[in-house]
Amino acid sequence: MPMPKERKFEWALKPTSSVSWGQVKNKSGQICVVLEHSLLRGVTSDMIAWWFRNFANLKVTLEDVEGYEGEKVPAYWLWHPSDHINAQFVGKLGENGTARAGAKIRIKETMQYNKYGFQFPVNQELEIFYCEKDGWGMGKRIPFFGKMIFLRISYKDVYEDGKIIGVHYHYEVVAGTNKQNIMAKAINKKLVGGFTAEFWEAWITHNTIEVGVFENFLPVLYSQRNDLNSLSYSKNMNPITQGMALQEQKGYDQNLLEERLKGYELSTNAFEYQQGAMKSILG
């Protein structure tokens, strides 16, 4: 997977201290991860839902980004300045080739490329199980075992004095089968073996940056949604400034994080507890 050169957007990237997360193994040996991002400021859930439906199809002209001046590139490259390579919607798509439940997405990226290179690559085709205004869910099934991994994102607008001040963004991942035969246990053991401390450090860093930069580029692209063939981005469009105390931000709902981790730990089938193809747990 050739890696495109880094995009120097000059954004202040959120640190991992701005998220709260935890990991448990349930009674069936499934790995369950819950992650609470800090409040996404200047963003709405409508913007995020629009992005998930469209992002793999979008191209954007980078007007003044060093090394990319005037170049039209995948909008997927804005979603992370160094780790993203390519994304493509395939299968039974919605209107104008948009994502919907039942379609698939092909993803090529790598976790924390600047530190680990291609040590933690992603080159997968995943099924989209949920694509609605309140969230996104995708995963992988294998014959005889069913779901093997499921990533579920939930988001909800947060109001103050009747106005939206940001988005609560909640992420859950389940990996492994709940089945208990010899083959299933061997599969789970292999999966768990790949989830090293280095892997989690790379994934959490990648995900913190990926979600955090919604504040930097998403309002700009969403404002141009009526002309998707002429999307553009320049550095003076950044709505978030350097001085907004990134280091002081924390995961939005610690109680929800702990509640979900406990639920997963007590579960015998984490996919049933996750309810990844149902409405958002945020209500």
Where are these regions (language model features)?
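Hydrophobic/aromatic beta-strand elements that line small-molecule binding cavities or substrate pockets
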Residues: 36-38, 124-127, 148-160, 172-173
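Short, surface-exposed loop and linker segments with low hydrophobicity and enrichment for Pro/Ser/Thr
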Residues: 99, 129-132, 153-168
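Terminal "cap-and-tail" regions of soluble proteins that handle hydrophobic small molecules
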Residues: 1-30, 158-283
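Residues at beta-strand starts and edge strands
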Residues: 29-34, 46, 99, 149, ...
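Generic structural hydrophobic/aromatic packing signal, biased to beta-strands
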Residues: 35, 79, 105, 126, ...
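Hydrophobic ligand-binding cavity/cleft-lining segments
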Residues: 2-93
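Glycine-rich portal/gate segments that line the openings of hydrophobic small-molecule binding cavities
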Residues: 73-146
